[in-house]
A protein has these predicted regions:
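Membrane-associated alpha-helical segments
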Residues: 252-357
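Short, well-structured alpha-helical interface segments that form or flank functional binding sites
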Residues: 74, 83, 212, 219, ...
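Extended alpha-helical interaction modules
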Residues: 91-250, 254
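Exposed alpha-helical structural elements
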Residues: 12, 46-50, 189-193, 244, ...
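Short acidic (Asp/Glu) and glycine-rich catalytic loops that position anionic groups and cofactors
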Residues: 30, 201-202, 299-302
Length: 357
């Protein structure tokens, strides 16, 4: 069968559907994912060079690679390049079968000394997952609490009851820890649950990057709104001399537009990351576990208000920009009317002098 000439990017677009398959994970097993912020494209090469240290002598990865899978001893390693961050995922197909010591990370000793601490870029999220076999009901909350060192745990059954997830969602030495009690998972399904938990934690942190920006911007917006109100009060009171007001308004508009240019993409990214968090929660198909607050309910109470603050700052900034534009139009209109009045007066004066002559 002979087909027309392919679009140059067709194969790449078709392969995108299969570019990032879920890794399979065994039970018992352990997973650690570390996300570091991507500062510039130059760091891509640094990541690939760092990964090459795990397999000396292996063929070099393509400079344009967006993902890479390799092995270091008994540990499987997966690297992915995203728009704003890198993810490094480490998987062990062996692990404790009991609660005691299930979150120990001795299996990471297979990595070269100091290699993990030297990952390129500042860390934004680290997620540790332990998968334990549990053919019956999950342990009572009281027996799980000592593992986390916290009495406040959240979790639920997931994957239509095939597993139970428990966490405290606290950052302990920079790591968020999850326990997955495997009731009836196969390796592929366990891998999907692990990936969703990793993405839930990572994208939650990425979404929160704009919260400090929103908090700072809210204070600035209050000041800028007061300045606009003061300018409009002077506009109403003034009978002439709109040029100084217009100059001040132009300066205010420039400051607001500068802030929008600096922070607009950050707020937009937050909304995209928030959407991913919501989708990952929905995909886990939660079921209630007695004694545990559901993960979605916990995030709804804690994470959602932060997201709404970011959305409010973005909307307030856009509204202020629109108000400034309307105010500028009013000032320009009045200035044009005044210039027209002066021109008419000048013409009338000239006509009068001509008549006297």
């Amino acid at each position: 069968m002979k087909l027309p000439t392919e679009f140059a990017q067709r194969q790449r677009l078709a392969d995108e559907l299969h570019a990032r398959p879920f890794e399979s994970v065994a039970t018992p097993g352990a997973v650690l994912s570390v996300a570091t912020l991507r500062g510039s494209p130059a760091e891509d090469a640094a990541c690939l060079a760092h990964l090459a240290l795990l397999q000396p002598g292996a063929p070099a990865a393509a400079a344009t690679a967006t993902h890479l899978s390799l092995r270091c001893g008994a540990v499987r390693v997966r690297w992915e390049r995203h728009t704003e961050f890198y993810s490094f995922t480490f998987i062990s197909d062996t692990g404790p079968t009991e609660l005691a010591g299930c979150l120990d990370a001795d299996w990471l000793n297979a990595l070269p000394a100091g290699w993990l601490a030297a990952l390129p870029g500042p860390m934004i999220a680290a997620t540790q997952i332990a998968l334990l076999p549990c053919p019956g009901e999950p342990p009572h909350v009281r027996s799980v609490a000592p593992v986390f060192g916290s009495e406040v745990l959240v979790g639920n059954r997931v994957a239509d009851g095939a597993a139970t997830v428990v966490t405290d969602l606290r950052s302990v030495q920079g790591v968020t820890r999850f326990l997955v009690f495997d009731h009836a998972l196969n390796r592929r399904r366990a891998g999907r649950i692990a990936q969703r938990l990793i993405e839930l934690d990572t994208y939650r942190m990425m979404a929160l990057l704009s919260l400090p920006v929103a908090s700072k911007r809210m204070g600035e917006l209050a000041t800028e709104e007061e300045q606009l109100a003061s300018l409009m009060n002077r506009f109403r009171a003034a009978s002439d001399g709109d040029e100084p007001l217009l100059a001040e308004l132009t300066d205010l508009a420039a400051r607001v537009e500068h802030a929008m240019a600096n922070h607009g993409s950050r707020f937009s990214a937050t909304q995209a990351y928030r959407g991913i968090v919501d989708r990952r929660l929905a995909e886990m198909r939660e079921q209630l576990v007695p004694g545990l607050q559901p993960l979605s309910e916990f995030l709804d109470r804690r994470f959602r208000p932060a997201m709404e603050s970011c959305a409010a700052a973005s909307a307030r900034q856009a509204q202020l920009s629109e108000r400034i534009a309307r105010a500028a139009q009013l000032l320009q209109t009045r200035a044009e009317v005044e210039r027209e009045r002066q021109n008419q007066a000048l013409l009338a004066s000239m006509d009068k002098r001509q008549g006297l002559q």
